[in-house]
Design a protein with these regions (language model features):
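Bacterial N-terminal signal peptides
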Residues: 24-33
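Mid-length scaffold segments of soluble, non-membrane domains
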Residues: 90-120
Length: 219
């Protein structure tokens, strides 16, 4: 009976689609079993979700592993915050390096929030909320963008206007308000039409640099 059901399902949706769906469900099941703590940390109860947050010393929903989001704006660098100077905004815990930065954030929190919940901006281009390292970032138009490393940052810089537009679109239409683990699983299985692998991006970056064309952010 089970074999017959699988055969019928394949006929209805197609073998390739069936394999994608099966993989999606399998990966999702593993994520639920192995990543409950991380899933909870990245999906708080407030409106600011999903977020690149972690459990730090028993405190859940800590943005960017406790790094000070205000330091990027005031000192043009990343700095570790402290639980001594902490604020809670939309169910997310933010740590700051000093009382001055905490006060600035408390006065206007939306000004200092990293784009796309603090996830790697280049991942959001493909609808995938993951990554986002405190020491890999850039400012564009007065906004803070995080990346999962130099390779991701360079990939985004290949086409800043186009990639920003795509990231804005997928964040607005798919990622914002979703469960990060399910969204990630979906878009790793059912990839967007413009998806590029890390190797493809690295090759494009290398080709551009070989032509003497630099990679730089505007704004």
């Amino acid at each position: 009976m089970q074999a017959l059901s699988i055969t019928l399902a394949k006929r209805i949706v197609g073998d390739s689609a069936f394999q994608n769906i099966a993989a999606w469900l399998a990966i999702g099941a593993v994520a639920c079993l192995m990543g409950c703590s991380a899933m909870n940390a990245q999906n708080p109860s407030g409106n600011l979700k999903p977020v690149n947050a972690h459990v730090i010393d028993g405190t859940s929903h800590v943005m960017l592993k406790g790094h000070d989001v205000v330091s990027y704006f005031t000192q043009n660098k990343h700095a570790m915050g402290s639980a001594q100077f902490a604020s809670v905004y939309e169910g997310v815990n933010f740590y700051f390096a000093n009382a001055e930065h905490k006060a600035l954030f408390d006065k206007e929190p939306s000004k200092y929030l990293p784009q796309y919940g603090g996830y790697c901006a280049n991942g959001i281009v493909y609808g995938i909320p993951w990554g986002g390292d405190a020491d890999s970032w850039m400012m564009l138009g007065g906004k803070l963008y995080m990346f999962g490393g130099q390779g991701s940052r360079d990939g985004f810089l290949l086409d800043v206007p186009g990639n920003t537009a795509l990231a804005d679109k997928y964040w607005r239409e798919e990622v914002a308000g979703s469960n990060s683990f399910w969204q990630r699983t979906k878009r790793l299985t059912l990839r967007v039409p413009h998806y590029k692998s890390g190797k493809q991006l690295a090759d494009e970056v290398a080709a551009k640099k070989a032509k003497g064309q630099g990679l730089r952010a505007e704004g």
